[in-house]
Amino acid sequence: MVSYWPVLIVLCLLPICHAKSYFADFVNGKGPFKQADALKFMDKMTILNKLQADILGIPQPDEFSALDFEDKIESKPDEIPYLFEGDMVLTDEQMDLIIKNVRDQYWARKSSTNEFLYAIRGKRSMTSFLSERWSFPVPYYIDTSSGVNTNAVLAGVAKWEQETCARFTRLNSYSSSSRQNALRFISGNGCYSNIGKVSRFPQDVSIGWGCTSLGTVCHEIGHALGFYHEQARYDRDDYVSILTQNIQDMYLSQFTKQSASSMVDYGVGYDYGSVMHYDQAAFSSTGGNTIATRDPNFQATIGQRVAPSFADVKRINFAYCNSTCSNYLDCQNGGYINPNDCNNCKCPPGFGGQLCDVAGTNSNGCGAGDITATSSIQTISASGALTCNYVIKAPVGAKVYFQMTAATFSRYSPCTTNYLEINYGRDFSRVGARFCASYPTISLSETNTLVVIYKGVNGARFSLNYRYDPVTFSTSAPTTTSTTTTTAPITVPTVSPTTTTTRQTTTTARTSTTTTTTQAPPTTTTSTSQCASWSACSAQCGGCGTQSRRCGTYVETVYCNTNPCTGGYCCRPFFYVTSFGTGYCRRPGADTPAAPQRYVEQRKG
């Protein structure tokens, strides 16, 4: 076992002993553990850290550093280095089980067969042990003598009661010897909580300095109700990558995965927008990201601490409230019967109505929320301090093509106060991709439904083009005769390596004229005598294709055929704009075609 007494001696020789020392408080029993339990817990954290290093295939980490603890807690009070995953107080039994599970993961990686068997056991994010679930109402006591922010605690409790069937009852007095399950809210060193109900005694939930936002209080209460962190789910590798090069090696244990058997999900998938998700730079040693989302469009979505997400609430309701309503409603789009109102469905963001089958209520100035996509480009836009919900429907069998053509938001990560959320996936119960500092790198929904949510403040705005895809999709009913009818696609003449752009302009005399210009691909410093001819463009319109040519040891490529496709659409990096009634494809930040991209051709053999 590792001894921490030498660390304490060094700590007390430093000037930090004359100020507040979180580490000294912790190992001296002034934190969430008694002194002996604190030292035992840190020994097990060291074991866990080394196991995690083995799993990740990196050198064995250094021992814990007390000085690092002080800076970390001051800057991020929900990332306490000597607690599991930064803010979780575990019992001895829970810690032993996690170490066992991490050992299982290590050996599973040694065998693809074992890894497969381990993987199919389930996808979970909440404690599966029924003994750790609460009975309602949950008694709680606010220890004002500790300096805890009473209003912050009450707001967090009220939020969970508003969204779920969970109920709490406030106690007027508290005894440390009371043999009663209860939550005691204190102002400790940082933010922390146990996982679920852990004993027949009151358990502490610390809402310390820097922990008083509604989302953070809800996060800690979420742990007490049984939540693990979202990025600790067994299936997290399908959704995020852990960037170990940016994690200080002594914090590797903060990125462990739970086993499938220790958590239960209730069919609610991985949610990037969960209030239980780490932010992108959690436990960073470099200031760089430690978590990268597999779909880069969700990078600015992870780590919000505003409020529980729809999926967070859904898990709690499924865990605790399934027997609340006896009636049946055909809830749509990921909605479910509201345990606080059994006559209506609880709807995911963007949706409303009794059955979640229409767009949610819009603020004045948003326009209609339920929209039907056609084969022609249409536009939605909004600006200012509004919340707008748009549900764009394409015909069944088609998809929704979209392009965000303009956006002005506060550039923060994660996107929390103002952003455009685009849910292009299949499961609308999970938060969509949020954009406040970037544009989407995707332009097609997975189904025939696209959900767009604008959350604005003064000065914010957005504009988004949409249509259904493909533009040749037939919306007519299929024929019942034995004759087979085939609709020929629209024929577009093959275009040579030179491209022609036609724009309509208006003179001062209000007469319309048409100007046609022909432009060859941009030239480079390489003599054209050294280059072969340009290849045919790989697509016929919309800047969707490229053409290439060989110039000595280089190959040059350039976008081509940037005239809009039928129905008015363009491929990335172009977007469709109109000028005086004529549409064309424009590349952001440029009014001329891009110079060819060059690379050295890799020859085989």
Curated annotation (Swiss-Prot):
Enzyme class, spelled out: hydrolase
Active site location: E220
Record's signal peptide: 1-19
Keyword NAD: no
GO cellular component: extracellular region
Glycosylation sites: N322
Domain spans labelled Peptidase M12A: 124-322
Binding site for Zn(2+): H219, H223, H229
One of the GO biological process terms: molting cycle, collagen and cuticulin-based cuticle
Domain CUB: 366-469
Propeptide residue span(s): 20-124
Annotated EGF-like domain residues: 317-357
Domain TSP type-1: 525-566
Cofactor(s) in the UniProt record: Zn(2+)
Disulfide bonds: C165-C321, C191-C211, C325-C345, C347-C356, C366-C388, C415-C436, C531-C551, C537-C560, C541-C565
Tissue specificity statement from the Swiss-Prot or TrEMBL entry: Expressed in hypodermal cells. First expressed in the dorsal and lateral surface area of the middle and posterior region of embryos. At later stages, it localizes to lateral surface regions, probably corresponding to hypodermal seam cells. In L1 larvae, it is expressed in seam cells and in a few cells anterior to the nerve ring.
A molecular function (GO) term: metalloendopeptidase activity
Residue numbers spanned by region Disordered: 479-526
The record's free-text note on cofactor binding: Binds 1 zinc ion per subunit.
The UniProt record lists the keyword Zinc: yes
PROSITE patterns assigned to the protein according to its UniProt record, in alphabetical order: ASTACIN, CUB, EGF_1, EGF_2, EGF_3, TSP1, ZINC_PROTEASE
Documented EC number(s): 3.4.24.-
Primary residence: secreted
Compartments where located: Secreted
Known function: Metalloprotease. Required for normal hatching and migration of neuroblasts. May act by degrading eggshell proteins at hatching.
UniProt protein name: Zinc metalloproteinase nas-34
Naturally occurring in which organism (per UniProt): Caenorhabditis elegans
